[in-house]
Amino acid sequence: WHITEEEANLSRQLTLTQNCINRLKNMRHSSHRKGFLAVRCLLRSANIPIHKIHYSTDGKPYMKQGPFLSFSHSKHFAAIAIGNVPVGVDVEQQRDKIVRIAKKFVNPIDKARTDTVAALTDLWCVKEAMYKMISVPGIRLNKDISVDFKEYQKGMATYKDQSYHFFHDSWSDYSCALTIKEKV
């Protein structure tokens, strides 16, 4: 979802739970509030009732009965992933800061470009989507997850000798990745 709406316009499209209202009140930046609301608009358009979404202690969204979920938003874009198997999604604006933190997520065995901000952001998105999907505390992105960009816009990620599919895309100055827990 390309977030072009004003916060009030997004809010008017939704009937928010008290929990959502409380969370919104605690968000300082308008871009964060708009991302939060855009995710809920996406959920509504996918017929996922907002009041049936719960959060684990580490912040992972889930439904007691229903599909697996993952959400992400960054400045002007929001994304959701819904699946019958665990999924993870991440969208990020490509920023120079990624170069400074690369050592925290680049694994020496990654088969990925790391020579540009865009390439590093693509890699970060895949690893962050994997982290959201796996949801195991203590995962070290630079040691526990490896990534192989096998083909244009898709590849395989590995965690504990299990392989998972991922898909990624980039546009203007954004990157997005989707991971799916399907053993190959």
Q: Where do the protein language model's features map onto the residues?
A:
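Core catalytic alpha/beta fold that binds nucleotide/phospho-ligands
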Residues: 1-184
